[in-house]
Amino acid sequence: MQLNLVCVGERMPSWVNEGYEEYARRLPRECALMLREIAPGKRTRNCDIQRILADEGQRMLAAVGGNAHIVTLDVGGKDWSTRELAEVLARWLREGRDIALLVGGPDGLSDACRQRAAESWSLSRMTFPHPLVRVIVAEQLYRAWTLLNNHPYHR
């Protein structure tokens, strides 16, 4: 199984890349976390946001392939505790399918992404900067993995 974090946005600050990599590299091969960046649509003062969202969504879905188990990161999703996320990760590992975690851009996710999703995960009721979401997701997935493997990281 491979975890694919599919995010709208490129050229992140170094602290984002370093934070993400710190946790992604700790995960073992059977639970590898890979980042797939999608270029954001060009936003201007009079742009058609729905068209941009649809285009970003189409490119996100194309990046994950047809057989992936899609999970959107969305404020309206389930707010799993760390232990609940560990149980979800254990289920994903048992099922063996690749997982695609979709993080939208500044205007969120397209309807097509939401419709294709098998699950939706909310990190918080608060809104986080999209670059920070990458780091939080990587850390939480690593923490969930350590719980499943009785590693002392999660205490």
Curated annotation (Swiss-Prot):
It catalyses: pseudouridine(1915) in 23S rRNA + S-adenosyl-L-methionine = N(3)-methylpseudouridine(1915) in 23S rRNA + S-adenosyl-L-homocysteine + H(+). It comes from the Bacteria. It is an enzyme of class 2 (transferase). CDD domains: RlmH-like (cd18081). GO terms for molecular function: rRNA (pseudouridine-N3-)-methyltransferase activity. Keywords: Cytoplasm, Methyltransferase, rRNA processing, S-adenosyl-L-methionine, Transferase. Its main location: cytoplasm. This is Ribosomal RNA large subunit methyltransferase H. Homodimer. Belongs to the RNA methyltransferase RlmH family. Its EC number is 2.1.1.177. InterPro entries: Alpha/beta_knot_MTases, RlmH-like, tRNA_m1G_MTases_N. The keyword S-adenosyl-L-methionine applies. S-adenosyl-L-methionine binds at L73, G104, L123, S124, R125, M126, T127, F128. Specifically methylates the pseudouridine at position 1915 (m3Psi1915) in 23S rRNA.
